[in-house]
């Protein structure tokens, strides 16, 4: 776990400090694999599992060699490859600073692939789009990296990319449905952990109350393995923070204010995750 935490810290610093690394995050081969093998659900599953198993096996083979340096380098390369593909903070800042017209539309378009619909210039839509982008670009990757190592990070990234690409390449409906279910199921535990972190660093009652209200609506349940609850919970948490921020009510329809608070909230959530990982490392050493 200590090496995993170190790899995550290095990856986050490099991804933020060296923007050119973003251009190395290429999965152009995935479309060819999906066209060749994704015609059936079994083939689509193979497209996800085969590369992930190979990467996981490579990581296992490198573990313990040269005091873990080889594994660390391999894990770092895998994280830099699977995070993103765009940097979250840069896109949030661009959206915050964008004027009206084409610049704003382009900034909103950066979040289109992270959401089922094109986000609109409204507080709720922007916060929902931003939290989905955070989940899919960063937190789900980190969750499965901590859980399963480099193979887990790649498995999630391939599942999400394949689910996004399936309509464009004309995959069968059954294959597309499988890919969407797998991607959603992999995102669900990461989304739930994000909500718990938000409850700790934001308005506890607003966050958990919104979580209960969303799941208590007809047709929804706690075991649906569906991360669709995340935008509603993020909006509730951000609204509560904005209203309490200066000791008086603030307009929660102010897109810029909500976007700024979302950026701060995501930083605090990341800090909670890293602190939790550090505590697990310390617990392992003490044991």
Please describe what each predicted stretch is.
Residues 1-287:
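Hydrophobic N-terminal alpha-helices or hydrophobic patches in metabolic proteins across all domains
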């Amino acid at each position: 776990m200590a090496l995993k935490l170190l790899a995550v810290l290095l990856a986050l610093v490099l991804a933020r400090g060296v923007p050119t690394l973003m251009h190395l995050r290429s999965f152009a081969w995935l479309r060819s694999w999906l066209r060749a093998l994704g015609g059936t659900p079994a083939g689509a599953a193979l497209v996800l599992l085969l590369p992930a198993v190979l990467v996981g096996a490579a990581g296992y083979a490198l573990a313990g060699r040269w005091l873990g340096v080889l594994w660390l380098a391999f894990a770092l390369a895998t994280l830099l490859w699977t995070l993103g593909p765009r940097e979250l903070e840069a896109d949030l800042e661009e959206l915050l600073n964008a004027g009206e017209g084409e610049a704003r539309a382009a900034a909103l378009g950066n979040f289109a692939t992270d959401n089922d619909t094109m986000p609109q210039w409204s507080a709720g839509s922007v916060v929902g789009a931003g939290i989905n982008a955070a989940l899919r670009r960063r937190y789900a990757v980190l969750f499965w990296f901590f859980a399963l190592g480099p193979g887990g990070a790649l498995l999630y990234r391939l599942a999400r990319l394949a689910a996004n690409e399936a309509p464009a390449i004309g995959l069968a409906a059954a294959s597309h449905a499988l890919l969407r279910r797998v991607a959603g199921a992999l995102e669900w535990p990461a989304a739930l952990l994000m909500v718990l972190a938000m409850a700790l660093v934001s308005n506890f009652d607003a966050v958990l109350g919104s979580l209960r209200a969303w799941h208590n609506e007809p047709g929804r349940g706690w075991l649906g393995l569906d991360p669709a609850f995340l935008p509603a919970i993020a909006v509730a948490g951000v609204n509560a923070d904005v209203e309490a921020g200066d000791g008086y009510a603030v307009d929660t329809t102010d897109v810029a204010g909500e976007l700024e608070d979302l950026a701060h909230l995501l930083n605090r959530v990341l800090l909670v995750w890293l602190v939790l990982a550090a505590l697990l490392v310390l617990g392992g050493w003490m044991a």
